[in-house]
């Protein structure tokens, strides 16, 4: 599974500005989903890869980013 890492509080994606390989996104994806996860900056959001099927990613149901 893949997807944008999401802030559970506000429903927003984790933003990033350095597209492609991005240490911040990799660190955040691994922190949330485990050290087997990958992560990079895609369309100014942190995109996580190699996730388990039940991983919660953006968008959150009934929670819009404000």
Swiss-Prot record:
Family matches, as PROSITE patterns: LCN_CSAB
Additional remark text: Is neutralized by the single-chain antibody variable fragment HV.
UniProt source species: Centruroides tecomanus (Scorpion)
Protein name: Beta-toxin Ct71
Known role: Beta toxins bind voltage-independently at site-4 of sodium channels (Nav) and shift the voltage of activation toward more negative potentials thereby affecting sodium channel activation and promoting spontaneous and repetitive firing. Lethal to mice.
InterPro entries according to UniProt: LCN-type_CS_alpha_beta_dom, Scorpion_toxin-like, Scorpion_toxin-like_sf, Scorpion_toxinL
Location in the cell: Secreted
Organism placement in taxonomy: Eukaryota, Metazoa, Ecdysozoa, Arthropoda, Chelicerata
Modified residues (Asparagine amide): 66
Assigned protein family: Belongs to the long (4 C-C) scorpion toxin superfamily. Sodium channel inhibitor family. Beta subfamily.
SUPFAM superfamilies assigned to the protein according to its UniProt record, in alphabetical order: Scorpion toxin-like
